[in-house]
């Protein structure tokens, strides 16, 4: 199918496995809508309200313990008394000598230890709940993404790199999971800590609070400045990772072709090109994000120094008081040092985690791009009763192009009668596979009409339509499952008797019985542990079990040996009996008994008739026949 579309330049995005714009072109970058992405992520997290509420409660307890420990430090310092080293006497405050207090000391110490223990416990549960919430959230997201992928139109997967789609399903969702797990609790805790610390600092010293704001302002300015450089780099990095996955997928699935044509070095060079580009972009991103930590630490230490310096000046000169009118002393300065450090710590942590958060948001945006795609419409106006369906197919002046103004099929008009066998013949790119795509409604026609039993297929639900059509592809598609389940893919509720009858009709019962596990034999990916002929026989058995009214055979015997082809032909003869059959084949020996042969050339019907009639015309079909059977040049 791919060849036809490529030959006709019908893949607007470069075709599967190439990525948008072709193999070596960089995808266009879009500006990120951070607010929208964060809002949608929060909706996913909000689906697990109980867990999220528990996390919030635990974080609040941890934050309160942290803030209370700061006040405990103030009381602990003040419990040692206040001694005037200049006058060599204890300070008298409000008529009370500030002597050491054992009671206040032990009470403060006990409270401090209790706060630290509670912090440790809360941090453990914060990590645990955060991880569990991340797993639950991303599981739902991954399930939604997969459910969306299987409902997208075939045109979407035809025009998007499969490796990039896989990257969104795996890498991007994993990045979201890791970020939610490691940063969600930190973000909530950080917000509460900032609010709590700010309230305490203002209460005990508005002047020192203003001094602490210097580091906050610097942190915000640096983060905003560096994010302008980091955001496009991380977006490009994610796109390049999708290209790497696409390249790897192509090489793994096509490794035999690579080896057969001694293409290993070229393949390696192509991969190195992608890998080097990814590394260069990744290195730039990591250099910038890596500098965030040292810069934030410097700003934090600067703020620490400013609090020490101005706090000492205020205390010595008696400048500034608390909101209660209390003069700043050693206890308040000690508390302020710790509180101001905690005040800037969440901001520094968020700044250092910025690259991870940005990667997750980029991945989330890529995931949401797929989730926002329009799904295939399976509804229909007319309900089809399979038991009453005959299988008459009418193509009336059908025209279609994968790209606007570039038709692949032009004025295609053919009548296929119930139970008849029609063969489509033509060079690669002539439109044969497109006809199948249109009949299955993988794509919708641009003009004209396709009818089954006089009913316009555009009015039939796609489910009803496809339930009555079975397709046997040249490249047999099997899944990593048992033989039995692969055959029953055509009818999941089939009985054992129906299954056995299907494999007998498809001539695959004998080789199945020779296998150690017989029908319970587990197939490897793509059925690689079976021969090509055995795989095709299983797909025929699947079609037999589906018991369709209409059958499509897409070059189903063009890549097997003569003996296997005979088995497949016998199975197909049984399968096609009393069914409307459409065959796509380049090997004219398989279609000589067809009721109607349609010869296509560049999307136009050039000849129609049975085998003998077309030979007598001495036209295109005759030349194809002579080429295959007489060795004559066209």
Tell me what each language-model feature is.
Residues 200-214, 284, 288-365, 370:
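Helix-loop-helix
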Residues 34-49, 165:
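A short amphipathic helical element positioned immediately N-terminal to and/or at the very start
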Residues 47, 154-155, 173-180, 184, ...:
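An intracellular "coupling" helix at the cytosolic face of ABC transporter transmembrane type-1 domains
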Residues 52-122, 202-207, 318-324, 330:
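Transmembrane helix-loop-helix hairpins at lipid-water interfaces of multipass membrane proteins
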